[in-house]
Amino acid sequence: MLNPKKKRKECYFAGILAAAAAISLLSGCCGGTPSLEEALKKTASYEQTSIPSPASDSLGGQWTVIALARSGEEAEDGYYEKYRANLEKRVKDQEGVLSENRYTEYARAVLACKAIGIDPSDIGGYDLGKPLDDFEAVTAQGLNGAVYALLSLNADRLEIDGELEQKYLTYIVKQEKPPGGFSLDDSSDTADVDLTAMTLQCLEPYATEEEISAIIDRGVEFLADAQAEDGGYEAYGDKSSESVCQVILALSTYGIDCNKDERFQKKEKGL
């Protein structure tokens, strides 16, 4: 099993890139300032230098492809083509099976394909979105499986299966922990920062629904209460920049200014 601390470190810069891009959409959250623009450019350059040939897995550059495409920063010539070639090779080599039990592999690939404007339904002759139709297999992985399946369904809203969408939404809503937030651990009564932030991101298209709006509000309050005194977050006993990035993404999704909202200012220190 992959050490969770190592995984968080590997995803760190991709998370920063995505979070910085999200912040830039908020005029009151340092958007458009030279320092933010410089951070975007430096991180985008670092990611592409560190991962010159992005692979189709969570640690090999797939998150980089997603974050880079969404950031608005220009990719190097042929960068996305390399990703597609690597993805097609993996799909063909494995006869369309990215994983037997981790269906986030399919959701992440669909998100990456849609982010760079290619059709995930024909990659090496395989439809990468098809496995996500298997509700039982996806949710067997847990809450994160359903969250990323719903995110991938909503990535472009084209030909979305409304019945399947509702099944995932209903499943996710039922996983809320009292008094708010979400966790990967079904047996836990305590919510988790990362899973709560991820789940809030996938609930945004439904924010006008009264029940969902209340869940979102409770989730945001949980994230505010879980924030450390230095303005950051901890995971596995260590300070976690990835958790900070996930929270920034979640807040930005709802137009919440992470640098001005009083709930996220701890001793004059914010995200």
Question: Which residues are covered by each model-predicted region?
Answer:
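N-terminal amphipathic/basic helix or basic patch
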Residues: 31-42, 59, 63
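Long, well-ordered core segments of solenoidal/helical folds
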Residues: 35-54, 78-98, 120-140, 163-183, ...
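N-terminal secretory signal peptides that target proteins for export/translocation
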Residues: 1-9
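C-terminal motif of bacterial Sec signal peptides marking the signal peptidase cleavage site
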Residues: 25-28
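Sec-dependent N-terminal signal peptides
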Residues: 9-22
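An alpha-helical repeat/solenoid feature that recognizes helix-turn-helix modules
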Residues: 52-75, 97-119, 138-166, 177-215, ...
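Ser/Thr/Asn(+Pro)-rich, low-complexity disordered segments
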Residues: 30-33, 71-74, 82
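N-terminal leader/targeting segments and the immediately adjacent pre-domain N-terminus
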Residues: 2, 14-15, 30-34
